[in-house]
């Protein structure tokens, strides 16, 4: 049975309308645009911002969502990551709606590459944190780091990054472990570092919220 996502003509046109409405195609100023993305942009707007090619952006989205479906079908785990302050709530929302682990505060160096230490920290969080009389500031720091990871029992089968440049260290750890990387990929990033780039605007909440709802729909098999 073919499980690949297909977009009928009307659905495709609707998706293009949504891309325009939610400013998905709006990239960075040309001087901040990575030359690697020249082949996926269609030009510049009047303000001098790069504009993604809508067909290529849609194709990248379909490819990424198909991969997410594949991971889900195999009962795999996707770790959602977005440590930029304005992403805190949206990352938590996606994690809770998809019943997936997430990191929306700070990235603890070695979280993936030093998995034994990470798993011990998660175990500590689950078993002891609420019982220990830690100072409020220290307790909050630990809770912010591990709240979204409390159900993570093993290394994830893939990671999803909302802002590549804000979490570049995450990509390095994932690549060293051959963990597939899905990421919203703006015009100022290196596409070579990402296995499943979703070509689109990662600088604003509006397009990220749009992508997030599509991801949630994919998990609930409504796409």
Residue ranges and their predicted role:
Residues 2-158, 163-223:
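Ribosome large-subunit tunnel/peptidyl-transferase-proximal elements
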């Amino acid at each position: 049975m073919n499980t690949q996502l297909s977009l009928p003509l009307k659905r495709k046109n609707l998706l293009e309308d949504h891309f325009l409405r939610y400013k998905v195609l709006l990239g960075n100023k040309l001087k901040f645009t990575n030359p690697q993305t020249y082949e996926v942009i269609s030009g510049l707007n009047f303000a001098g911002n790069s504009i993604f090619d809508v067909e290529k952006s849609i194709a990248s989205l379909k490819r990424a969502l198909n991969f997410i479906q594949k991971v889900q079908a195999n009962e795999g785990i996707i770790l959602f990551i977005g440590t930029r302050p304005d992403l805190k709530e949206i990352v938590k929302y996606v994690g809770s709606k998809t019943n997936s682990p997430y990191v929306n505060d700070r990235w603890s160096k070695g979280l993936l590459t030093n998995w034994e230490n990470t798993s011990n920290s998660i175990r500590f969080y689950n078993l002891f944190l609420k019982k220990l009389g830690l100072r409020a500031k220290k307790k909050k720091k630990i809770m912010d780091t591990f709240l979204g990871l409390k159900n993570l029992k093993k290394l994830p089968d893939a990671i999803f990054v909302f802002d590549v440049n804000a979490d570049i260290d995450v990509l390095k750890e994932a690549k060293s472990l051959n963990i597939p990387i899905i990421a919203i990929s703006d015009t100022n990033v290196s596409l070579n570092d990402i296995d499943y780039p979703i070509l689109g605007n990662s600088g604003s909440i509006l397009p990220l919220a749009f992508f997030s709802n599509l991801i949630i729909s994919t998990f609930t098999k409504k796409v």
